[in-house]
Regions:
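Beta-sheet-dominated interaction scaffolds and their linkers
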Residues: 26-49, 148-163
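Short acidic, flexible loop segments centered on an aromatic residue
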Residues: 53-69, 174-190
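Terminal connector regions
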Residues: 99-145
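Intrinsically disordered, low-complexity Pro/Gly/Ser/Thr-rich segments with frequent PxxP/GP/PP motifs
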Residues: 72-101, 189-200
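N-terminal signal peptide c-region/cleavage motif recognized by signal peptidases
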Residues: 19-24
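Solvent-exposed coil/turn segments that connect beta secondary-structure elements
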Residues: 64-66, 89, 95-99, 116-118, ...
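Bacterial N-terminal signal peptides that target proteins for export
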Residues: 2-12
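Asparagine-centered strand-capping/turn motif at beta-strand->loop junctions
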Residues: 48-52, 168-174
Length: 200
């Protein structure tokens, strides 16, 4: 993608991960921290787990674009709403729509897969109920890009860091997205105010 990203000099050593760990106290959670949809797939299934031992929940699923706006142009999530019993699983099938063929074929495209849990109505008065939502990254990976995944020559080795002034330029010449989840100094001091960076 040949884009560069700047961050402060304290971020000299980066732990590069493809996705940040999912931290959630929701009852309904997906079975993964990211979704990669390969261009040669007809569908992909995400399992939703209800961790509550006593209550059933409704689970609503949809996709958003990279600006967090609901997007129904390229993919559909079915069923959009389902009931999941206590300590049980549900499944959401994500399928491409015809417009998915118009997505860039030389690089990944970023979307977000969302799940909102809807608790059963409480029979207790004056009870505040929250509909918690989990959002994970959803990457569309075209066939031509998927062919570049080589475990013997990882694409991550092509990433470079270059000092410039009081900062660092992070160059990602690959067609893949990546997340930098942590950074620190040469003395292995983790930057306390470091925020995840998503780099195209």
């Amino acid at each position: 993608m040949n884009k560069t990203n700047h961050f402060k000099r304290q971020a000299l050593i980066a732990s590069v991960l493809l996705a940040a760990p999912l931290v959630s106290h929701s009852a309904i959670v997906p079975d993964r921290t990211r979704v990669i949809f390969n261009g040669n797939e007809n569908s992909i299934t995400v399992t939703l787990k209800n961790g509550n031992a006593t209550l059933p929940y409704l689970a609503q699923a949809w996709l958003e674009d990279d600006k967090f706006a609901k997007d129904t142009r390229y993919f559909t999530a079915l069923p959009p709403l389902q009931r999941i019993e206590p300590k049980s699983d549900g499944q959401v099938k994500v399928q491409p729509l015809p417009a998915a063929a118009s997505l860039p074929q030389d690089r990944e495209s970023l979307f977000y897969f969302n799940v909102r849990e809807i608790p059963p109505k409480s029979d207790k008065p004056n009870t505040l109920q929250l509909a918690l939502q989990t959002r994970i990254k959803f990457f569309y990976r075209p066939v031509a890009v998927a062919r570049q995944v080589d475990k013997t020559h990882p694409w991550q080795t092509k990433l470079t860091l270059t000092y410039q002034g009081d900062g660092v330029i992070f160059d990602n010449p690959t067609p893949f997205y990546l997340v930098i989840s942590n950074a620190g100094s040469k003395e292995n001091e983790t930057a306390s105010d470091f925020k995840n960076l998503l780099i195209a």
